[in-house]
Amino acid sequence: MSGKDRIEIFPSRMAQTIMKARLKGAQTGRNLLKKKSDALTLRFRQILKKIIETKMLMGEVMREAAFSLAEAKFTAGDFSTTVIQNVNKAQVKIRAKKDNVAGVTLPVFEHYHEGTDSYELTGLARGGEQLAKLKRNYAKAVELLVELASLQTSFVTLDEAIKITNRRVNAIEHVIIPRIERTLAYIITELDEREREEFYRLKKIQEKKKIIKEKFEKDLERRRAAGEVMEPANLLAEEKDEDLLFE
């Protein structure tokens, strides 16, 4: 096993405990990222479905708005000059909010009306009904355009977040966890080898002590048989020592 396949660490019991904790942390992180990816994917599919529905509805609304414009021009004449003259500031404005999905911030756009209708009296002479219908249709078109912009922005943001999350999951699952597992296996192998070496060393020491003891006992028996070894004195025996007189 090369050093690139595992983490460079000195094999010990403490290192084994650390690697086990890191492995558990990596597995927990992978599981959390998978749950995050699933949540993002679910929201991604919901937004995709909503985009398709909104685009289909957008086509119908824009077609209806174009017909309303043609109808209003036919009934009320060319009112573009009146519209241009009454332009002061935007009556329809956009504000942005934020939505959080599994830690990913998604922008949400909303439209709102500000001020009074500058074209309230437009078409009072003729074509008032057609102009009112025209304003309603284009107001609906603006509403759908804002909603579509919000959905598409969220779609792109989620797509990028899902890719990043999946890359992290793959990195943890196929690089980090296997590397920690190989490091842990290396530590266990080294510790087992040390235990075997220590057991073999202790066994050899015991055998050597046994040989030395047997040799000593044989030598002692031989010397006893030859009368070279005196029996040890019994310190508990009741023997009287001779009196020593000092002159």
Curated annotation (Swiss-Prot):
Membrane topology listed for this record: Peripheral membrane protein
Transmembrane regions: none
Domain of life: Eukaryota
Any Pfam family the entry gives: ATP-synt_D
GO biological process: cilium assembly; protein localization to cilium; synaptic vesicle lumen acidification
Keyword Membrane carried by entry: yes
Subcellular location: Membrane; Cytoplasmic vesicle, Clathrin-coated vesicle membrane; Cytoplasm, Cytoskeleton, Microtubule organizing center, Centrosome; Cell projection, Cilium
Keywords: Cell projection, Cilium biogenesis/degradation, Cytoplasm, Cytoplasmic vesicle, Cytoskeleton, Hydrogen ion transport, Ion transport, Membrane, Transport
Keyword Hydrolase: no
One MF term in the entry's GO annotations: proton-transporting ATPase activity, rotational mechanism
GO cellular component: ATPase complex; centrosome; cilium; clathrin-coated vesicle membrane; extrinsic component of synaptic vesicle membrane; nucleoplasm; plasma membrane; proton-transporting V-type ATPase complex
Xref: Gene3D superfamilies: 1.10.287.3240
Cited function: Subunit of the V1 complex of vacuolar(H+)-ATPase (V-ATPase), a multisubunit enzyme composed of a peripheral complex (V1) that hydrolyzes ATP and a membrane integral complex (V0) that translocates protons. V-ATPase is responsible for acidifying and maintaining the pH of intracellular compartments and in some cell types, is targeted to the plasma membrane, where it is responsible for acidifying the extracellular environment. May play a role in cilium biogenesis through regulation of the transport and the localization of proteins to the cilium.
Family (UniProt): Belongs to the V-ATPase D subunit family.
Subunit structure: V-ATPase is a heteromultimeric enzyme made up of two complexes: the ATP-hydrolytic V1 complex and the proton translocation V0 complex. The V1 complex consists of three catalytic AB heterodimers that form a heterohexamer, three peripheral stalks each consisting of EG heterodimers, one central rotor including subunits D and F, and the regulatory subunits C and H. The proton translocation complex V0 consists of the proton transport subunit a, a ring of proteolipid subunits c9c'', rotary subunit d, subunits e and f, and the accessory subunits ATP6AP1/Ac45 and ATP6AP2/PRR. Interacts with SNX10.
Protein name: V-type proton ATPase subunit D
Organism: Mus musculus (Mouse)
Designated gene of the protein: Atp6v1d
